From Swiss-Prot:
Name of the molecule in the record: Glycosyl-4,4'-diaponeurosporenoate acyltransferase
Listed transmembrane segments: 126-145
Organism annotation: Staphylococcus aureus (strain bovine RF122 / ET3-1)
Biological-process GO terms, alphabetical: carotenoid biosynthetic process
Pathway(s) served: Carotenoid biosynthesis; staphyloxanthin biosynthesis; staphyloxanthin from farnesyl diphosphate: step 5/5
Major location (coarse): membrane
Region forming the signal peptide: 1-28
Record carries keyword Zinc: no
Membrane topology: Single-pass membrane protein
């Protein structure tokens, strides 16, 4: 019985830890100026093996499950609400590209706090590593899948004469 109480207590504290840490990381991430994400950073580059996002769909079937991911705006009102994308124009698409970069960065950073469990019991460590990966990697994959497609759409819009000022 003591062991069960200990596990329940540990699970509760781990859950609270992740809730507080991830909400704070997301909140801080929304405060990073857009100009940071307009620059070309290597971490946001689409690599050759990704084949403009096709790799992610071929190996992870992104199109089949990406719509099931909770929209971050439902948890944090500072996160870009994709539902307000009413018109497809270069300004809106550029904003979406910026937000894919922001989301990817936030979710990479959200994995890092798992190091606090490094000295903990093996089971606690493994469960928290699993949680950190399951909660963040799918979102990173979706961003890496969507961004090249949005970038291509932006190029098409600009080529057709719609200019972004």
């Amino acid at each position: 019985m003591k062991t069960m109480k200990k596990y329940i207590k540990t699970a509760f504290f781990c859950s609270m830890y992740w809730l507080i840490v991830q909400l704070n990381i997301a909140n801080l991430g929304t405060r990073i100026p857009d100009k940071y994400f307009r620059q070309k950073h290597i971490i946001f580059k689409s690599f050759n093996f990704e084949k403009h996002g096709k790799f992610w769909n071929k190996w992870f079937y992104v199109r089949k499950w990406k719509h099931k991911i909770l929209d971050g705006h439902q948890l944090n009102r500072n996160i870009y609400d994709q539902r307000h994308l009413m018109t497809i124009n270069s300004d809106e698409i550029e904003k979406m590209i910026i937000e894919t970069k922001r989301a990817e960065l936030i979710h990479w950073i959200s994995i890092l706090p798992v190091i606090i469990f490094n000295k903990g019991p093996r089971l606690v460590k493994y469960i928290n590593i699993f949680y950190a990966m399951i909660a963040n990697v799918p979102i990173i994959i979706v961003q890496r899948y969507n961004r090249p497609r949005l970038t291509q759409l932006l190029r098409i819009l600009k080529r057709r004469g719609e200019r972004h000022d």
